[in-house]
Amino acid sequence: MIELTKVTKLYGTVIGVNEIDLVLEPGAYGLLGANGSGKTTLINLLTGQLKPSVGAVRIFQSDPWAESNVRYRLGLCPATDILYTNVTAFQFVRFLLELQGINRLDSAELANNALDVVGLDDKDRNRPMGEYSRGMKQRAKLAQAIAHDPELLILDEPFSGLDPVARHEMTTFLQDWVTSGKSVVVSSHILHEVENIAQHYLLMNHGRLLAHGSTTEIRDLLADIPREVTLRCTDAVKLAGVLQYQECVESVGVLDGNLGVIVRSTDANSLFDALPNWITEHELNVTEVESSDESLNWIFDTLLKMHQGEI
């Protein structure tokens, strides 16, 4: 679906993205990184709005910069609110469909269908967009992105500025989109916004792609990084005494109130494999196990620290 080969984009002497090699099959992807990490530049390359300075971009085996036909297979919901204030959402979506060569009658039907899907009722879709709230503007942008039924939907910071209700509605829509078998790339600088949508993640920092894959695949990149595991139990001192002699344990600390221990392990998988036997053998009552790497935030924060030489 997406293939990038040694892609670099320069803005004068400034590097937008740097030597990205990437192959993505159809599916749902979260594009993650801080503001200025290169996410929007990458999206503009994928959608044919920018030409790479070096390397090649292929979407459905075509060059989106040079081959306009492939762009009909894409839907883009941009981050910016560049909307005509005196135009209604219906007029906006219909006009963009007409630009694709769809006749006026069919474009009107497709526009109304898309506006139905995103939840803009008859009254709101026929009001000037200058009167819209941020959430309504996002719905209008989303409607134009899906009206032509694209194979790949790309959204740049779609949750930005939305209230909790609108965020929930956006999440539900994207979950339904993925469930229907269509592909999506969702850009965000906030991890939890895409956790309920994407199965695979791409992490960018300073124009570079630090890692990509499923949560499990990315976690495997950190196999040699010590992790903290919290074990809650009824006798923390006894548990600490057992753990301190194990090869996979680097250190053990007892929680306040003797309610459990914090274990620092260089091989968390071995720790988890052996733990049931230790509990049985020493008659320990462990009530809860919690690992730091259960959080995607921890995984991505750790990758960033590795890239910056802090680990």
PLM-predicted stretches and their roles:
Residues 94, 98, 106-124:
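Conserved ABC ATPase "signature" region
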Residues 153-157:
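Catalytic Walker B motif of ABC-type/P-loop ATPase nucleotide-binding domains
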Residues 171-263:
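ABC transporter nucleotide-binding domain
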Residues 128-135:
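Conserved ABC ATPase signature
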Residues 55-70:
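Conserved ABC transporter NBD signature motif
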Residues 47:
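Helix-to-loop junction immediately C-terminal to a conserved catalytic motif
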